[in-house]
Amino acid sequence: MVSVLLFEQHTRCQRSDTMAKSTYRTLRGSIFGNGNLKRTLLLDDGLINQGYRITGFFVWCGELLDGNCKATLSSQPKVAGSPQDASINTEIAWTSFVQEMAATSIRSSVQQDPVIDLDHVVNRDLYLSFNTNNIDLTWNYLIVMEARKLSDDEAILAIIREEAQNVGA
């Protein structure tokens, strides 16, 4: 139990140190419909040396109805109905949500832990794509980003990566 307390205290210290050095921003909203839904979230503020690292990505249903969706964040628009694909360099984060509101007493909502490419820094545009079941529902989203100052070299690499070019390791 002592080791757990020490770990929690150490984690808190690390978080407060990080918070002092970083600025966090959120994008949130909702989108209504079914099938393939898209939203363009423009992050291009004209500052080439400003980037954002996605640190959190959450979606959930706004109604108490059966529904499910897959959501993807990308630096380029996705083709409607295309699957989530980690081999595509422009895709940054993936998540899904399933809600079952059956007529029985058992009701459930499940949010998949988001899978986020923490090496990707968004420098210009960010696209949010939903692939949902065929029911008109309101889907909510919350995206947490860490604002980062980029050197000229880092900014150029971020733009190259946004255009789906592999910069290698």
Q: Where do the language-model regions lie?
A:
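Extracellular and analogous surface-interaction loops
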Residues: R39-G51, V115-H120
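Intrinsically disordered, low-complexity segments
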Residues: M1-L5
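Short, well-structured hydrophobic secondary-structure segments
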Residues: G46-W94
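Extended, solvent-exposed segments with strong compositional bias
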Residues: K78-V121
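N-terminal low-complexity, charged segments
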Residues: I106, L118-V121, D125, M145, ...
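Noncatalytic modules at the cell exterior or secretory-pathway interfaces
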Residues: Q50-V59, L118-N134
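C-terminal interaction-tip segments
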Residues: L6-F7, T11-L37, G46-N49, E63, ...
